[in-house]
Amino acid sequence: MGFKNKLVIGYIGSFVDYEGLDILLEACALLKENHGDAFKLLLVGDGDVMQQLRRTVRFLQLEEHVVFTGRVSHDEVQRYYSLIDIAPLPRKGLRVCELVSPLKPFEAMASGKVLITSSVQALAEIVDYGKTGLVFEKDNANDLAAKLELVLTDTELRKKIGKNANKWVLENHSWDVISKRVTDIYDKILEENK
């Protein structure tokens, strides 16, 4: 895939408008100006905006920087996360994005990747800024490019955030932790209704 000696910025998921992949492409075009040899963008998935994204890649002259895999099975997702260093989630400032939190950020963090989310509430509240990830101003490709550049050029920050993110997910959002919380809630309800 041509990733040797490159940092991999990667997105795994559905290619729909509200995910903001057009914003990610714009940010990568800006990043290319000063760091073109330093990164590749891996886009894993498929969806309604796939052809639009391919046209945008050509328009922004990102053909040498972007790799599309198409849809992959859920069993292959972890293999692709193993290739990724930085996991941006550029969701747009739409109501559905403000309210609904996907599992993607937890998967990326559990894999020890640097999570960079847009400032939509459902994502921003997951991140402890600078510790477990970074947040950029929603719908702002310039700010996303700045955050990408920050972690692209700072190896220590990248390692620290990835390690902290992994630890935080294991301590707060593993299936064992979640099942204990749910069990505790049920136990409390049962106790109150005796």
Where is each model-derived feature located?
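Conserved donor-binding/catalytic core segment of Leloir-type glycosyltransferases
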Residues: 2-28, 42, 182
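A short, well-ordered alpha-helix in the C-terminal region of glycosyltransferases
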Residues: 143, 150, 157-171, 181-184, ...
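Nucleotide-activated donor-binding/catalytic signature segment of Leloir-type glycosyltransferases, i.e.
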Residues: 44, 51-78
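Short Ser/Thr-rich beta->loop micro-motif in glycosyltransferases that lines
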Residues: 89-98
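Conserved acidic donor-binding segment of nucleotide-sugar-dependent glycosyltransferases
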Residues: 129-130, 134-141, 150-156
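Short donor-sugar binding/catalytic loops of nucleotide-sugar-dependent glycosyltransferases
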Residues: 12-16, 31, 47, 72
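Short hydrophobic beta-strand element within catalytic cores of glycosyltransferases
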Residues: 86-89, 107-117, 127
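Short acidic/histidine- and often glycine-rich active-site loop of Leloir-type glycosyltransferases
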Residues: 99, 120-130, 134-135
